[in-house]
Amino acid sequence: MAEAAQAQQQNFAIQRIFLKDVSFEAPNSPTMFQKEWNPDVKLDLDTQSRELGEGVYEVVLRLTVTVKNEEETAFLCEVQQGGIFTAGQMEEAQLAHCLGAFCPNILFPYARETISSLVVKGTFPQLNLAPVNFDALFMNYLQSQAQENAAAPSEA
C-alpha cells in the first residue's frame, strides 16, 4: 500500500526543450565537394544535469560529430540540446537514471534532427545518426564508477 502511494506521488514532466548551443564548421570547403565522398564519422556525446529548483532539472545533451574524408575534416558539428524537466518524489537511484538516461533519450531526436539539418545546409550528403542506447551507456557509467570506488584504497 505504501509503495502504491509513493508511486502516485512520483511525477515526471517535460517543461521545455530548447537548443542551447550550435556550431557547424566546414573548414575545407569548397575543395571537399570535389573529392570522392568516403566519410569517416566520429560521434562524441556527453550529458550534464543540474537542479534548477526543487524537483526541476536542466539536462543538456551535447553531441559532437566530426566527419573526415580522405584524412581531411569535411565538417564538424556540435549541438547542445537542453531540456527542463520536473522529476519529483523519486528515490536517488531513480532520479539518477531519469537524468542520466531517460531525459537524454528524449533530447536525442531533437539534436539528431538539428545535426541532419545543418549538414544538409552545408550541402553535404544527409547524415542520419543511429539511435543511442542511453540506458546501456548509463549502466556502463555506473559499473565504471563502482569499479573505480572498489579500486580506490580505503582510508582506515
Curated annotation (Swiss-Prot):
It is found in: Cytoplasm. Belongs to the SecB family. Homotetramer, a dimer of dimers. One homotetramer interacts with 1 SecA dimer. PANTHER family: PROTEIN-EXPORT PROTEIN SECB, PTHR36918. Coiled coil: none annotated. It comes from Aliivibrio fischeri (strain ATCC 700601 / ES114) (Vibrio fischeri). This is Protein-export protein SecB. The keyword Cytoplasm applies. One of the proteins required for the normal export of preproteins out of the cell cytoplasm. It is a molecular chaperone that binds to a subset of precursor proteins, maintaining them in a translocation-competent state. It also specifically binds to its receptor SecA. HAMAP family: SecB. It comes from the Bacteria. GO terms for molecular function: unfolded protein binding. InterPro entries: SecB, SecB-like_sf. GO terms for biological process: protein folding; protein tetramerization; protein transport. The keyword Calcium does not apply. GO terms for cellular component: cytoplasm. Keywords: Chaperone, Cytoplasm, Protein transport, Translocation, Transport.
